[in-house]
Amino acid sequence: MDTQVKLAVVVKVMGRTGSRGQVTQVRVKFLDDQNRLIMRNVKGPVCEGDILTLLESEREARRLR
């Protein structure tokens, strides 16, 4: 398992998900690897340009329907 913390910047806010809309789905770009974009679910306030600290960088969220 990847124990190193990765930093990623929010490129685009895709939408809200969860049973009550408490989770925001975002597309992030890693600061150390500029070519890699993944989708993540974020709990709490988030906007474009925010830097996230990811404890697990391999997990990707399913797309919104």
UniProtKB/Swiss-Prot annotation:
Disulfide bonds: none annotated. GO terms for molecular function: structural constituent of ribosome. PROSITE patterns: RIBOSOMAL_S28E (PS00961). The keyword Ribonucleoprotein applies. This is Small ribosomal subunit protein eS28. Belongs to the eukaryotic ribosomal protein eS28 family. The gene is RPS28. The keyword Cytoplasm applies. GO terms for cellular component: cytosolic small ribosomal subunit. It is found in: Cytoplasm. Gene3D superfamilies: Nucleic acid-binding proteins. Keywords: Cytoplasm, Ribonucleoprotein, Ribosomal protein. It holds the Pfam family Ribosomal_S28e. SUPFAM superfamilies: Nucleic acid-binding proteins. It comes from Zea mays (Maize). GO terms for biological process: maturation of SSU-rRNA; ribosomal small subunit assembly; translation.
